[in-house]
Amino acid sequence: MRFGPNVVEHAPFSISMIGNTATGYVIGLTPEGAAVCHRMFSEDVPEAEVAAVNADLPVHLRRGGFVVEGERADEGSLGKSVEGAEGTESAEGAGGAESAGAENAAVAAFSSPALDSHAPLQSAYLHVTHHCNLNCIGCYSAVDARNARRDLTLDELRGIIDALADAGCQHVVISGGEPFLRDDLADIVAYVRERNIDSVDVLTNGTAVTPEKLAAIAPYVGRVSVSFDGPNAETAPVIRREPLFERLVAAVEMIREAGIAPHIIPTAHAGNIDALGEYAVLADSLGATMNFSLLSAPLENDELAAVIPDDAALARLAQATLALSRDGVPVLSDTPVSTRLTTTCGCGAGCAMVSVSADGEVFPCHMMHDEAFSLGSLLEDPGCLAARRAPAPRVGELAACADCEIRYLCGGGCRARAYFATGDVEARDPYCALMRTFYRLLFEAMLGRN
């Protein structure tokens, strides 16, 4: 048995692991397992020798796509030993690990967004309007004179949807501006489904939804997500700057009554980290699912700087996130922290996912609508999606992450946040302390269970 490409070895918190960055699979190893796996980067190890370490290890190596078979195994060393692993006893992952026996534990495989620009496009944000009736601080899609700008026509948007579908996209998130300000929103989402794109979500600020508009999109949309500020009417609105709580609750109820799955997205910031559990209670009371977004601030935004969490607040956020995680579902968006471990070398922005602005321009993700990262215009060149590329190197090539023991768990975090905070897309994610604390607590919990 010999490793193929995309296999890495590492030892977060002194626990030996191998992972496959293409499949997301993680296997925790004993020192004996780590030693035999280390050899598989450079030699073909007999399967019987691998099984002698643990009978289930070959099963998990095949299930996770770690090994090459037959002639490919004779082509030379395809795997890449990234980090020497000095192991201890392995731990079963919280939230549903697959056991590989008493001596080794293999965490269940989860899809990891590819960083291969030749891989099919998996998902895309499609911003259908610049127009918005709110003025939230930190809005990622804010542009000058947004309400004076021309919206793309339905035919122009259909052309963009054609390009996304032809590139293999299977999930579209409709965003804005405020999508419900468009009278033809139902026509847009209907065409997405007509092009056999599997799922469509809509993001909204919740103030422009009506039962009629929801009924029109209900046959085509799987989920409508509503941005929330405070968890109750008494909390001061930090992001939206005007009291909207009751209107947002009414919007979620309308969404549910229309037969669409409601979802709420509060923004986690320095002012509400200690009240995150209240949002979970709110979501449950509304029959909605939930995750938090993380507040990101451009260098020059002094208004936002006052509510960006410091490292102490991020440590508390990590504790709250672990407490709120349910069945491995990530509580934080744009941050790979959940109770199910996965191997990743990056978030997939620019390769597995893209974002199309309300002008038809393509960017790596919805947080990177900056001309420095433009991949082209779908209005001018529908084929520009073929030139997709990541905005930054893989985590193993990032100097800021070179000595970090969790880099193949977090994938380097969010490159957009790094760029916002420092002006350098290869810099350390300003939320690094959150991820490090989260994984430390998670591993402590895992070890405590075994």
Regions from the PLM with identified roles:
Residues 5-28, 55-89, 96-125:
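N-terminal [4Fe-4S]-dependent radical SAM core
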Residues 36, 43-51:
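Short acidic, hydrophobic short linear motifs in intrinsically disordered regions
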Residues 38, 311-341, 361, 365-412, ...:
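C-terminal accessory region of radical SAM enzymes
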Residues 117-155:
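Canonical Radical SAM [4Fe-4S] cluster-binding loop centered on the CxxxCxxC motif
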Residues 141-150, 369-374, 407-444:
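Iron-sulfur (Fe-S) cluster-binding segments and ferredoxin-like electron-carrier domains
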Residues 149, 154-178, 182-296:
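Radical SAM/AdoMet-radical enzyme domain recognition
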Residues 161-177, 427-450:
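Short Fe-S-cluster ligation motifs
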Residues 346-351:
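Short, small/polar residue-rich loop motifs at catalytic or cofactor-binding pockets
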